[in-house]
């Protein structure tokens, strides 16, 4: 080896170390985000955040970071997490900030679920697209959809009675709630269910959704580092990619079938078709298909997650369960008297249970990420430069003493005027997000939550299988949404005097 080659070989590590040292110095001393509190390692590298992302512990880590550093924390070199109750939601979600390109690569290309630039004409298209879909989720539309929702809730109750009458074995309520909510949303969208409750099995495309969730963590990391994106094809299962293509084709076929089928009953598609091209606003067929795919997930999995969490919390808090049983049994002398209107207006404790379950175990635990537009913005009192990724972590915000007293205690009474919780910052509680991109399906979600929990409590005595599911909540992991283990519950028909 000649002298020149030896010098070049020895210099290479030094160059690498020099570049690394320069980057560290820049990130800590010169970077526009250097004034944001947070761990120094997180300011320099994505690795600490990625480690928790892969482990499914991002929300627990967010709670810890906000406890240590405050309401605004730099969690990655170009990402900031906020939990400020009064300012974070309106500052980030109350205006049409740009949806981050990081998640834009994961989402479908839809006029409603994706906007490239929050301050140009495409933002207007986004708002217009929501107007078309909003008719399907109105209070009036929900009343017309009640018979369909009731039918599947009744099927849930009937099938549980059939299965549990034969033996005293526990059943996995995570699975049963998913079957119910996916059947409801499929019938509302396509005019026919997945058939999960009928067959007591998970439809192949429902299973595909849960398989896909496991890939989101790695896709997120790869999207953060453009020079690593070529690894995506090596990491993501090619069979899974093919199944996703098959699912998209299946959704399009189902939409076509529903469009070509006349039906007197109101459902999502009837409202979309009736209001499309209203006042010159029209979704293309591709956008209808894309939003049907989105609504299949958003209108089912998150509701089932809340129901699973609420059931676990009720069964591990006997006093709360007894109070809820007393309310349901006294308000509804018969099973048939449980209607959407009745559970909304006559069951304050049930509604408090749902609100507290949404706070304690939010179905979407992480924040919807946004990118600060050109020129930068002031957010929660901090100047944030353009291009920075922002989000409000729901789980961290709801489990912070800065926003809620006794944040790690499950107390439905906090929503019923208990004076101990009068100083809770309700503005920090936004389980369906906030502003022009807030969840359109909140009315349907609340309706399903109330109706299913009320009829489950009215119909059954439930008991958690302590051996299998005692630590269920602790074993849940976050893959953007919750990955939930089996929730084994013994369900026995209630004896009505």
From Swiss-Prot:
GO biological process: biosynthetic process
UniProt: heme binding residues: 439
Keyword Iron among record annotations: yes
Keywords from the UniProt entry: Heme, Iron, Membrane, Metal-binding, Monooxygenase, Oxidoreductase, Transmembrane, Transmembrane helix
Protein name per its UniProtKB record: Cytochrome P450 monooxygenase caaC
Swiss-Prot/TrEMBL cofactor(s): heme
The family this protein is said to belong to: Belongs to the cytochrome P450 family.
This protein's GO CC annotations: membrane
Pathway: Secondary metabolite biosynthesis
Keyword Oxidoreductase assigned: yes
Membrane-topology descriptor: Single-pass membrane protein
Source organism (scientific name): Aspergillus niger (strain ATCC MYA-4892 / CBS 513.88 / FGSC A1513)
Entry function: Cytochrome P450 monooxygenase; part of the g ene cluster that produces the acyltetronic acid derivatives carlosic acid, agglomerin F and carlosic acid methyl ether.
Top-level taxon of the source organism: Eukaryota
Compartments (UniProt record): Membrane
Induction of expression: Expression is positively regulated by the cluster-specific transcription factor caaR.
TM regions (residue ranges): 15-33
Principal location listed in the UniProt entry: membrane
EC number: 1.14.-.-
MF (Gene Ontology): heme binding; iron ion binding; monooxygenase activity; oxidoreductase activity, acting on paired donors, with incorporation or reduction of molecular oxygen
